[in-house]
UniProtKB/Swiss-Prot annotation:
Organism: Escherichia coli O1:K1 / APEC
Domain of life where this protein originates: Bacteria
GO cellular component annotations of the record: beta-galactosidase complex
Binding site for Mg(2+) 1: 417, 419, 462
Name of the protein in its database record: Beta-galactosidase
Record text on cofactor binding: Binds 2 magnesium ions per monomer. Binds 1 sodium ion per monomer.
Site (Transition state stabilizer): 358, 392
Gene: lacZ
Assembly behavior: Homotetramer.
């Protein structure tokens, strides 16, 4: 029977979800994850605890538009029309309500602490059984690892408590509410609460019980908290494991705590003590606490490179050894400190190869499973990442255990963001919001402080700088001086951060924003009195086809010791799967669910697609972050290791010399390089090529044996050098055939054997080619100066809010997309051994000339068409996206073969990872399926391209696919693209960079813009 005080009406009347002073009711204090083993061996080996029971699975669910619409009867029994949903899940992924994607703008009217009356509410219920043994002694808790955004809990019709902060556990004591046998839980989840104002992160806004739910049985007298810390002497040869243990329950003299440290099957150290803490002040110490210190000789240190772990088992027992319960955690012996302006791990300066990671799954929303977490970690390690920032909230508890074990440095970030507030620190400088902020910071620290992978605490993200930040910074430094604290808000270098941690600061360019200037990272280091390390909390915005200029950051990181790396934004595209009317899945972004407000495709900034398929940019990141660097001098290769702790015990260096992709010599040498060491490798006398071509030396570091995170044969690093070649000239063989020119009223036609070329005299374009009777072109060969806009070209521009500074808006305003060709010249001449076509076009818009393109086409007796192109660019038109040619080939071949940079997509400012070789790929692999279609698939540095019967030679860039630039530009989602007839070929003499320092302002560096007034390129086109 529901008591009056437990009634839904009474609970709703309090409106706890609109009171920033109420962040919880009856919630238990935060602590590390517990399992309450009753066998110390099971604790040591981390076996499943019999005292920990999952409640994940099918729950009954009913959705209402507001909490007031929930009937009182729901507390007692399931509603007749209730559905069944899986917990954990987001209810939006089950068709209830709509997910909302917004970056800065709050999804609700900003009126803190109040939320809309229309507040979608999910009512969950579960019937489960409890064994009598759990009720006879001890305490039964329920743990909700994550509920968004706030919830009330009832058990057997009685109100238990309230919780908010969607990214940390809410734990309640159910002991007084349970009875043996069948019990019923009722959980009312509200989509919006005052806590939503602190959760304005750039992500999908979803709701529900989206993390694990479990029951935990603890003894009446129990371990209520424990903290482990490692300390060292100067040379790390001796360590102390300090364990502070706190108990709850009857404090009896016979109680003891034993802490034992294990390395595998070996007990390294152990200590036992009664309760009674060290003296704190004149009143004494804590009677319910004890601190034990275990000495460890020559500890094996933990790092992301070598994640050595011990296991600490904490036993609560009586004096005669009777075990009451045991808790345990992995222990990594490591020290983090800042000294002389450097962030040090175990005395060595770190170089952070980091990435920001949202918890996102394309099918399950914000629900994370172990398989996906492990997949992310393996991909990060395989691509030379060593650090991850939990952006922008504490992650699933299992994530930290996996980072401990596989080896990743973690920035653990509080679930605080008020980006949409004006000013941004409106709440964070308001003392009424300090309790809510405090809970989010302190509970994160209390949950995660035993993880060695957590090396930095973060106070949150994009919330300005307020007095509350200063207070919480001081609290962390007081309770956990073993880790630095970072916080970007307020300018990235306030008193609330130990690390200068800007976002999207550029290498050499200042961004003098009012109040919070964003200096170049080089300048920041030299500001008067500034001696902190600089680690970019976000940089290299990887939205769509991006990450241009990434190499420039890494050049600076390696040049300036206090520039200690950064965290790329971000790891995974946040697209969600929807289904069309035929049941086919497609990738959706902001606005596709009818969600308003929305920020469209801005949710897709990942180095990997939502299904974890890599973007081409991931290879660039891997290459720039590689742990081996190479220098070539003569025939000597100098290999430098950037590992701080790891000796190269699983690496071979494979080298190969190739002429135009044909191997001439190769070899393999084992690497024997110590941490931060060097190895010189002398190559044998290299063979001299007998023919013309490009001679390249390629080195690759290969791991012959599988590791915990990679398969055997994994390539971890590589480099290429172009070698000097002998001068060699291959003269064309004489041809007795002479192409024949005929002229009609509309065309010039050239014929040679079974080949014909047709130039339209009115347009001046190559309008058709024949091989035998087969036409080769579906569209004429024309100049091309534009590209389907990248996200970086678009910036923040949209239909209702034009940004005139965005590249695409400049190109549109100047008429680049609408330019039409005015023919200035089209002549044909018969030479002694060839036919020469000469054309000139003025590309104009509204009477203004933007480009003048002059071409000659020389068709010789071998059937080769040599195209020379000279382009003049108007001085007052924006720098073009490309200078090249385009046509639609009639042929559709299965494969593309080219000699140039590859195999992955590459662009002028993102090509350091590409290698020069002869590549052969399916046509479908030449297209990169960005969810928001754009220019894609370029391959630079190309000397030869083979496709179907066609061969192109020169020095050019190309992309080739079934989609035109026009279709890419006009299509909003990749699943709406349709394969066009034939194949679209774009061959560029020059192509602008793609940028990527950020995606909302022009970020293509000057050296990668097409800023010259005149351009020339040459191309040879023939048929095989």
């Amino acid at each position: 029977m529901t008591m009056i005080t437990d009634s839904l009406a009474v609970v709703l009347q309090r409106r706890d979800w609109e009171n920033p002073g109420v962040t919880q009711l009856n919630r238990l204090a935060a602590h590390p994850p517990f399992a309450s083993w009753r066998n110390s061996e099971e604790a040591r080996t981390d076996r499943p605890s019999q005292q920990l029971r999952s409640l994940n699975g099918e729950w009954r669910f009913a959705w209402f538009p507001a909490p007031e619409a929930v009937p009182e009867s729901w507390l007692e029994c399931d509603l007749p029309d209730a559905d069944t949903v899986v917990v954990p899940s987001n209810w939006q992924m089950h068709g209830y309500d709509a997910p909302i994607y917004t970056n800065v703008t709050y999804p609700i009217t900003v009126n803190p602490p109040f939320v809309p009356a229309e507040n979608p509410t999910g009512c969950y219920s579960l019937t489960f059984n409890i064994d009598e043994s759990w009720l006879q002694e001890g305490q039964t808790r329920i743990i909700f690892d994550g509920v968004n955004s706030a919830f009330h809990l009832w058990c057997n019709g009685r109100w238990v408590g309230y919780g908010q902060d969607s990214r940390l556990p809410s734990e309640f004591d159910l002991s007084a509410f349970l009875h043996a046998g069948e019990n019923r839980l009722a959980v009312m989840v509200l989509r919006w609460s005052d806590g939503s104002y602190l959760e304005d992160q750039d992500m999908w806004r979803m709701s529900g019980i989206f993390r694990d739910v479990s029951l935990l049985h603890k003894p009446t007298t129990q371990i209520s908290d424990f903290q482990v810390t490692t300390r060292f002497n100067d040379d790390f040869s001796r360590a102390v494991l300090e364990a502070e243990v706190q108990m709850y329950g009857e404090l009896r003299d016979e109680l003891r705590v034993t802490v034992s440290l294990w390395q595998g099957e070996t007990q390294v150290a152990s200590g036992t003590a009664p309760f009674g803490g060290e003296i704190i002040d004149e009143r004494g110490g804590y009677a319910d606490r004890v601190t034990l210190r275990l000495n460890v000789e020559n500890p094996e240190l933990w790092s992301a490179e070598i994640p050595n772990l011990y296991r600490a088992v904490v036993e609560l027992h009586t004096a005669d050894g009777t075990l009451i319960e045991a808790e345990a955690c992995d222990v990594g012996f490591r020290e983090v400190r800042i000294e002389n302006g450097l962030l040090l791990l175990n005395g060595k300066p770190l170089l952070i190869r980091g990435v920001n990671r949202h918890e996102h799954h394309p099918l399950h929303g914000q629900v994370m499973d172990e398989q996906t977490m492990v997949q992310d970690i393996l991909l990060m390690k395989q691509n030379n990442f060593n650090a991850v920032r939990c952006s922008h909230y504490p992650n699933h508890p299992l994530w930290y255990t996996l980072c401990d074990r596989y080896g990743l440095y973690v920035v653990d970030e509080a679930n605080i963001e008020t980006h949409g507030m004006v000013p941004m620190n409106r709440l964070t400088d308001d003392p009424r919001w300090l309790p809510a902020m405090s809970e989010r910071v302190t509970r994160m620290v209390q949950r995660d402080r035993n993880h060695p992978s957590v090396i930095i605490w973060s106070l949150g993200n994009e919330s300005g700088h307020g007095a509350n930040h200063d207070a919480l910074y001081r609290w962390i430094k007081s309770v956990d001086p073993s880790r630095p604290v970072q916080y970007e808000g307020g300018g990235a270098d306030t008193t609330a951060t130990d690390i200068i941690c800007p976002m999207y600061a550029r290498v050499d360019e200042d961004q003098p924003f009012p109040a919070v200037p964003k200096w170049s990272i080089k300048k920041w280091l030299s500001l008067p009195g500034e001696m902190r390390p600089l680690i970019l909390c976000e940089y290299a915005h990887a939205m769509g086809n991006s990450l241009g200029g990434f190499a420039k950051y890494w050049q600076a990181f390696r040049q300036y010791p206090r520039l200690q790396g950064g965290f790329v934004w971000d790891w995974v595209d946040q697209s969600l799967i929807k289904y069309d009317e035929n049941g086919n899945p497609w990738s959706a972004y902001g606005g596709d669910f009818g969600d308003t407000p929305n920020d469209r495709q801005f949710c897709m900034n990942g180095l990997v697609f939502a299904d974890r398929t890599p973007h081409p940019a991931l290879t660039e990141a891997k290459h720039q972050q590689q742990f081996f660097q190479f220098r070539l001098s003569g025939r000597t290769i100098e290999v430098t290791s950037e590992y701080l702790f790891r000796h190269s015990d699983n690496e071979f260096l494979h080298w190969m010399v190739a002429l135009d992709g044909k191997p001439l010599a190769s070899g393999e040498v084992p690497l024997d390089v110590g941490p931060q060491g060097k190895q010189l490798i002398e190559l044998p006398e290299l063979p001299q090529p007998e023919s013309a071509g490009q001679l390249w030396l390629t080195v690759r570091v290969v791991q012959p044996n599988a590791t915990a995170w990679s398969e055997a044969g994994h390539i971890s690093a590589w480099q290429q050098w172009r070698l000097a070649e002998n001068l060699s000239v291959t003269l064309p063989s004489a041809s007795h055939a002479i192409p024949q020119l005929t002229t009609s009223g509309t065309d010039f036609c050239i014929e040679l054997g079974n080949k014909r070329w047709q130039f339209n005299r009115q347009s001046g374009f190559l309008s058709q080619m024949w091989i035998g009777d087969e036409k080769q072109l579906l569209t004429p060969l024309r100049d091309q100066f534009t590209r389907a806009p990248l996200d970086n070209d678009i910036g923040v521009s949209e239909a209702t809010r034009i940004d005139p500074n965005a590249w695409v808006e400049r190109w549109k305003a100047a008429g680049h997309y609408q330019a039409e060709a005015a023919l200035l010249q089209c002549t044909a001449d018969t030479l002694a051994d060839a036919v020469l076509i000469t054309t000139a076009h003025a590309w104009q818009h509204q009477g203004k000339t933007l480009f003048i393109s002059r071409k000659t086409y020389r068709i010789d007796g071998h059937g080769e068409m040599v195209i020379n192109v000279d382009v003049a660019v108007a001085s007052d038109t924006p720098h073009p996206a490309r200078i090249g040619l385009t046509c639609q080939l009639a042929q559709v071949s299965e494969r593309v073969n080219w000699l140039g940079l590859g195999p992955q997509e590459n662009y002028p400012d993102r090509l350091t990872a590409a290698c020069f070789d002869r590549w052969d790929l399916p046509l479908s692999d030449m297209y990169t399926p960005y969810v928001f279609p754009s220019e894609n698939g370029l391959r630079c540095g190309t000397r030869e391209l083979n496709y179907g019967p066609h061969l192109w030679r020169g020095d050019f860039q190309f992309n080739i696919s079934r989609y035109s630039q026009q279709q890419l530009m006009e299509t909003s989602h990749r699943h709406l693209l349709h394969a066009e007839e034939g194949t679209w070929l774009n061959i560029d003499g020059f192509h602008m960079g793609i940028g990527g320092d950020d995606s909302w302002s022009p970020s293509v560096s000057a050296e990668f813009q097409l800023s010259a007034g005149r351009y020339h390129y040459q191309l040879v086109w023939c048929q095989k």
